[in-house]
Amino acid sequence: MMYSRKFQILKENIGLYHGDFMDFEVYDTEYMSIIFVKDRLDYTGKEIEPLWAFKTFDIQKDSIVVFRGRMEVTTENMKDLKDIKREKDIKTPIKSEDAINFVVEHFDVIDLKTIYLRQRLLVFIAKEVIESYNIKLKRDGDDLYFEDKKLSVCIACKGTVSAKIHLGINVKSKGAEHVKIIGLEDLGIKDIDKVMREIAINYAKEIDKIERDLRKTLPLI
């Protein structure tokens, strides 16, 4: 069961100065909070820092924050060292003019391998939701492709207090110039909000199911 709450925050409190308030909804499942941001919000890489959901939305719980906006991540805010080395001469390696973004934070005691497994779970769920529109995608690790064009970017990382995931899925095929990209609208998907909600809700439900399974399983003797 999910419980819904609606909020507004003063934009200047989170470093935004266009407009007055930002609207968002919070859906609480048993173990997670899902934050749907109704206004446009850009992803810069700073959002993957620990406690961003608490600082921004006052959420002190495992969470998945969902929003739509530009993606512009410079190397200073990237977490993938291989990509940083490979794309060191590109000013903004991760770039999309319009994307849906999912920022996940978990506070249980986990290692880096576990958060990467959860990242793969999120990517599998996203693939499943998008393919329900009669679209066949390819997955390579944590990246989704349509034919030879890249649809998404994703990273998982771990800090001192939490572990985090970012998944960004292009809506339009405009942005990065050094990579062939494609967006959901190019694939014929028009109801972007529905896709955002399905991916986030399905991930939270899966985490809830895993948590409940942990609490019913007898140990090996």
Swiss-Prot record:
Pfam families: DUF366 (PF04017). InterPro entries: aa-tRNA-synth_II/BPL/LPL, DUF366. This is Uncharacterized protein MJ0805. The lineage of its organism: Archaea, Methanobacteriati, Methanobacteriota, Methanomada group, Methanococci.
